[in-house]
């Protein structure tokens, strides 16, 4: 993995830029994310004895997930941003530990389940990153934003906002995300769309748009995602 590219992609998380734009590190979305994780695990009857999250942020996802797993399950979170690590340390316990580090600090074959949630789009050399993640555990669960749609291309401010406010370096469709995983050596076991945008409406305009998205999605899910966006991709891989 290119060390210069890695350093460039990590800079916003180390110099406080990301913290300034996202002061709670998206912790408020954690219960929703955990519900999507559990949906996938239950679909495949996966009951991990050990879980690692790469890019664990403020640590709330692992804390929320822990209460839904066997009490003996060991959970570890790795995060490169010191600000987030300090927040996550407050959430640690006997079976839940957080570390200041990245994918290179996780031992190969060290867990049953690796979580990589809303991380891939932030990594400059994302293909090198995916190759590193591949051998860390048995199952890998990715959550990837689908930023490219007809709407986002027509509204040029949409992708620019993803870059400047959310620090997305790469933009995906469902097909390009799945292809990237397959081309870096993964076997895709299952995937589904997640309503990561439509479930959160903080203005009446967004509520109207998201209601329309939900209606269209119920009829033509793939077409809705390609045209209107508003959904992300949850992928289980080996």
Regions found by a protein language model. Give the residues of each.
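Conserved helix-to-beta-strand junction in the class I
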Residues: 132-136, 143
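Short, glycine-/aromatic-enriched active-site segment of Class I SAM-dependent methyltransferases
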Residues: 21, 143-168
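A SAM-dependent methyltransferase catalytic signature shared across enzymes that methylate proteins
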Residues: 176-192
């Amino acid at each position: 993995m290119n060390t210069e590219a890695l350093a460039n992609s990590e800079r916003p998380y180390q110099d406080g830029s990301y913290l300034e734009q996202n002061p709670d590190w998206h912790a408020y979305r954690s219960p929703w994310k955990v519900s999507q994780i559990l949906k996938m695990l239950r679909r495949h009857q996966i009951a991990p004895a050990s879980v690692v999250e790469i890019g664990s942020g403020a640590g709330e996802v692992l804390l929320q997930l822990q209460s839904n797993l066997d009490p003996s399950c060991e959970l570890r979170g790795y995060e490169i941003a010191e600000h987030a690590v300090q927040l996550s340390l407050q959430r640690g316990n006997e079976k839940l530990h957080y570390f200041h580090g990245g994918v290179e600090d996780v031992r190969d074959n060290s867990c049953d389940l690796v979580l990589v949630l809303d991380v891939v789009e932030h990594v400059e050399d994302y293909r090198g990153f995916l190759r590193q993640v591949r051998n860390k555990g048995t199952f890998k669960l990715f959550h990837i934003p689908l930023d490219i749609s007809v709407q986002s291309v027509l509204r040029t401010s949409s992708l620019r906002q993803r870059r400047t406010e959310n620090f997305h370096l790469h933009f995906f469709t469902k097909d390009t995300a799945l292809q990237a995983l397959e081309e870096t050596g993964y076997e895709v076991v299952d995937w589904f769309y997640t309503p990561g945008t439509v479930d959160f409406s903080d203005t009446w305009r967004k509520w109207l748009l998201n209601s329309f998205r939900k209606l269209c999605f119920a009829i033509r899910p793939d077409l809705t995602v390609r045209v209107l966006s508003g959904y992300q991709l949850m992928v289980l891989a080996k």
